[in-house]
Amino acid sequence: MTVANFIGLAEGSIENSAREKGAPFYDGLNFHRVEAGAIIQGGCPLGNGLGNPGYKFKNETPKSLNHDKAGVVAMANSGRNTNGSQFYITMRPIPSLDGDYSVFGQVEKGLGVIEMIEIGDKIVSVTIERRGESAKVFNVNEAFPAKARKKL
């Protein structure tokens, strides 16, 4: 669900209360939280860490996905099962976050860019590269149906 949520918001295929239908959610949003040497956080439609997409969903925290290196991408939340649109990227291992946040990605290239991001820097656009046949036919709304999203 977590990956499908991020892809759906990035591509504009998941309905939300912050953007018009079909509009890419993350384009133009800012990074509202930066903890030097630790994490950067973005994805808030209000730009201050208090916004959401109008729904929340459950945590997915398998023990195999950890905050064990720089570049881990995970959902930010305000408590268990309150995931929405906000995400963060780690700049170093932070094992204290394990089990409480849904890890769903890893930055593979450009880790140095993360360290240059400052509060207020904009996300110009998010591009999802669908490589391979299974990625090309992946249906976000089947993987993350509306019933899995609890309206706020």
Predicted regions and their residues:
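Cyclophilin-like peptidyl-prolyl cis-trans isomerases
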Residues: 1-152
